[in-house]
Amino acid sequence: MTTTTTRFVQLAACAAASLLAVAASGAAAQGVGSVITQAVFNSMLPNRDNSQCPARGFYTYDAFIAAANSFPAFGTSGGSAELIRRELAAFFGQTSHETTGGTRGSSDQFQWGYCFKEEINKATSPPYYGRGPIQLTGQSNYQAAGNALGLDLVGNPDLVSTDAVVSFKTAIWFWMTAQGNKPSCHDVILGRWTPSAADTAAGRVPGYGVITNIINGGIECGVGQNDANVDRIGYYKRYCDMLGAGYGSNLDCYNQRNFAS
């Protein structure tokens, strides 16, 4: 190959790489990426790549955007800028708690989201222990998520903790999907959920608190004030403040019965 030909190939490769970078940047600048920019993502999760975090290097901005783009209604369909930003604050608030490496009561407690990608106690429900931003747990959830995403997550659950795009997709899938008598987190935060008579009797009212109930109500709800609720709310408020969104009402589930009761 001549020097001229080699130079041409190198230039072509550089041009192709530049086009891919521009395309990725353009995709990020639309939809969710218009609110959660790379800079905002880094500011929200400043310690995710800390040397103390087992998930360091895993949760990338590009992986989040790629996953979000697979769910066009996620973080884009609130009907107002306020609700769009509130949904994203709520999503990151809940998932940051699920993956937190923060120390309760410390000054930077709510700056340690996305520190973990796998549950610490893997004996909880092997091999379907918690993985990813939402800590997807249990064979039924791996089956349902896999069916929705076109992946064999029952046969290969480790995909959720080894492929960052898949990991984010499972979290967003859970967020967007109603299951049984539980509404979707998406509908709740956008004010599209109307409680049934049973919900009202159980104290389940629209707001961030019922999202906690959807995710982990069997442990955290109906038991009065507890550290987990406080942590979820703290992350949520921090992100609302960063994104310029109001908190809404009913932030906790202290007095709500869980959906299985």
Swiss-Prot record:
The keyword Ligase does not apply. Residues 1-29 form the signal peptide. GO terms for biological process: cell wall macromolecule catabolic process; chitin catabolic process; defense response to fungus; polysaccharide catabolic process. Keywords: Carbohydrate metabolism, Disulfide bond, Glycosidase, Hydrolase, Polysaccharide degradation, Signal. Expressed in roots, leaves, sheaths and meristems. It is an enzyme of class 3 (hydrolase). InterPro entries: Glyco_hydro_19, Glyco_hydro_19_cat, Lysozyme-like_dom_sf. This is Chitinase 8. It comes from Oryza sativa subsp. japonica.
